[in-house]
């Protein structure tokens, strides 16, 4: 039996076909009830007799509508019929071999530690594969993957920052497809910017297939007024524009894909840069970015949020660099970009090394967050305070300045990153599933391995922990990417800085060995490391930096980590250089 669905207010069709086989002498009939197609099976059984039910489902989708609906639906049904000619064991064997080959190339292995750690990595990679529409660049990764209808399947900045890196270092063609999703939706982003009085592209906070803003207008109830509160993210959480540009540059530097950067990448960089240039306001002789929400999200409608301003600067800076490199003829843009970079005010690091989150954060009072941190992820702070009240205190939902330190590591010293971590983490409740992973990576870069592992482990328990209701609406898709990030960018110390691949490995004491695959500029690497040494096998000669020192690898090389010292200032030296 099959059903063809034409989605309302859309341009897509879905066909669902089902074949149910039942062993033995059975009677079957079919009915339709309340928009359901039902197959009824009855059988007379003796004690100990076994009946086997085999159900095969084929789901098809299209958005071109070139063929007549019935003809397309019949073609989809024929695909099911072809599969039904094979036995369950035959279909299982094909699937098993496909997964075997995939795991052989992609699996990350950990020796030592608890069984949970390896299971968490396997769990993360499994979902990172199945929930990514690698076959369709007009779709992206839903906030709940394929496991539930939370957030209505919408796409957030989570994709570019938490999910794309896995694909970038595992299968760059998938990362390219995810970025082309944003490129296809440029018209909607340009229209949103225009409606708000700006130029360039303002991508929606919650995105779907059309590229239009999908964020609901209202959400939770204000505990003081009893009224529904407006969702402010779509109005002012504009950092996702720069996050997308950051992902474009990460892709470009990791792959060297000139065909992409000269076309789709250039368009994304220029349009996002134009947005920031028009978004800035002049205050005396400087440009500032006002009325924004940073990743924190508990601090709303502030001026000069550090994350937003630094990322906007990076966005325009990289757009200008690519424009010059690939011969952009838009002289007006180049002039405006140069002036923006010259005049934009960036929050300055204080003498104690802390970067203020925004213009007003440091003047707000701090409160004891112990009971709220103990219930991290539950947003219990909003049971005691309204959002307006939370906004007037030093309270973070998730990493903000620490997130900036993670995304642009080359721009901040290790001392400043440590100062920010020590200042902001006690003020962070970790009410977002994404917060602890980022704190863990920055902690690892600062040499705080015990704290880093604790953050990573707690991040794995968001959906794999004791709470049976953590994924009632679906798993936290981005948190699966965060598990990979914590292991590879945290403990293995993988990062891309100024176009170079860096490895600054430091395993937690719970792990004796970590082995993982890595793609870099056309080369397939296999990296295996422990506390003393690192082995790198490559499909072609490659250069990278190990603890800051440039090394070359051909075929397979083993390095003693004791020969590569990483001082606190982040500049590597060998023992010989020290002498």
Where are these regions (language model features)?
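The feature captures the catalytic groove of carbohydrate-active enzymes
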Residues: 61, 147-155, 205-263, 271-342, ...
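C-terminal beta-sandwich/jelly-roll accessory domains of carbohydrate-active enzymes
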Residues: 537-578
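Gly/Pro-rich turn-and-neighbor structural signature
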Residues: 106-139, 309, 329-360
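Helix-terminus loop motifs that line ligand-binding clefts
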Residues: 132-147, 173-246, 252, 259-261, ...
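Active-site core of glycosidic bond-cleaving carbohydrate-active enzymes
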Residues: 155-185, 237, 246, 263, ...
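C-terminal capping/lid segments that line or modulate ligand- or cofactor-binding pockets
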Residues: 162, 207-210, 214, 298-326, ...
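Acidic/polar, glycine-enriched structural segments that form the non-catalytic walls/loops
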Residues: 1-151, 385-389, 568-579
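Contiguous, well-ordered alpha-helical segments that form the cores/surfaces of helical PPI scaffolds
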Residues: 122-129, 149-153, 157-168, 234-250, ...
